Amino acid sequence: MYYSMTDGILIMAVEPKGAELLSICDMTQKNKEYVWTGDERYWKSHAPNLFPFIGRILGGRYTYRGAEYELKSRHGFARDRKFSLVAHSETSMTFSLRSDEETKAVYPFDFEFLVRYDLQKNKTVGVTYTVRNVSETEKMIFALGSHPGYRVPLNPDEKFEDYFLEFSEPRVPQRVLLTEEGFLTGDAEPLELEDGIRLRLRHDLFDHDAIVLKNSAKTVALMSKSGKNGLRMHFDGFELLGIWHTNKSDAPFVCLE
């Protein structure tokens, strides 16, 4: 089961599980699909929402106020929970996940997590996250992220290496270094970009897990040298940008997280 909406130009589909975006099709481009298809040979997801943790927890356990909690799944639990559709119009959908006994067994906070999708002008999709601390006395600790995958290449006459990421302004972002298990080392190193703005895609870029950047520009475009199709993502308010596909593979997608 999924919910859909259209503005006559784009068609979007979202499923209640994880409030996960399944599809963005461009009707003006013969229903061209932009979102990764979820082919299990590479990665079975499409665009999971990450809450209340990002990545793994060391040992799958953590302690809060003297109590130990176990959560071995990657990227929290929201991606695996069924959200409620609380608002739906022709061009907007809002999904809600509230804390319950099951969530409090692994995450001891009262919360509401809202994910809103909007179809806006000029072929623009808006995604808005709202995290509400329902408790009047307890401070709430959480992490929040977005993990959308996009098809690369977008056209049958192109290949993965025809694509590149282009940032909106020249900078030298810092690449956050990870251990082999995907944990932070605490170190970072400069990532030199072509002309200060461009990263050409190659499958071997991801042989050692994701490229995680801090201090990058807050707008990045996925483009092809053919100039046929692409997309632009704005991520104001987020500290880090992750770039990933399945490591040591020829996966035909890239995630901009």
Map each language-model feature to its residues:
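Beta-strand-rich N-terminal accessory domains
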Residues: 1-64, 71-73, 215-237
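Active-site pocket scaffolds in enzymes
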Residues: 229-257
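Buried hydrophobic-core signal for structured, non-transmembrane domains
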Residues: 14, 66, 127-131, 256
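Hydrophobic residues positioned within well-ordered beta-strands of beta-sheet architectures
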Residues: 3, 12, 93-95, 113-115, ...
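Active-site/ligand-binding surface loops and adjacent short beta/alpha elements
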Residues: 141, 149-235
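Surface-exposed, gly/pro-biased binding rims or lids
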Residues: 101-105, 171-172, 252-257
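Acidic, contiguous internal or C-terminal segments within carbohydrate-active enzymes
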Residues: 99-154
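Extended, loop-rich substrate-binding clefts of extracytoplasmic carbohydrate-active enzymes
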Residues: 65-67, 72-122
